[in-house]
Amino acid sequence: ELKNELKQGYKEKLVDIREEIMRKRRAGKLPGDTASVLKAWWQAHSKWPYPTEDDKARLVQETGLQLKQINNWFINQRKRNWHSN
């Protein structure tokens, strides 16, 4: 009885928390096909991996990502994997 009352009282909050956790889990990884498009561009331009605005616009169209996501991916990729020497 008490257990059911508590469940009902907190049900909405528990649902909100569960949804928030699921959103956070999804963050961080791009879908494989999207990542492969970006990686292909990266490999083709490995000596100077700085896409032009036109390149970025094309990648937005090809991947369906937002421009900010494209920019962040390249920033992170350069920090983690590129040595200009």
UniProtKB/Swiss-Prot annotation:
SMART domains: ELK, HOX
Major subcellular location class: nucleus
Record domain ELK: where: 1-21
Lineage top rank: taxon: Eukaryota
Biological-process GO terms, alphabetical: regulation of DNA-templated transcription
Tissues showing expression: Expressed in all tissues examined. Highest expression in leaves.
Entry's Gene Ontology molecular function annotations: DNA binding
Similarity annotation: Belongs to the TALE/KNOX homeobox family.
Protein name: Homeobox protein knotted-1-like 6
Organism encoding this protein: Zea mays
The organism's taxonomic lineage, starting at the top: Eukaryota, Viridiplantae, Streptophyta, Embryophyta, Tracheophyta
Gene expressing this chain: KNOX6
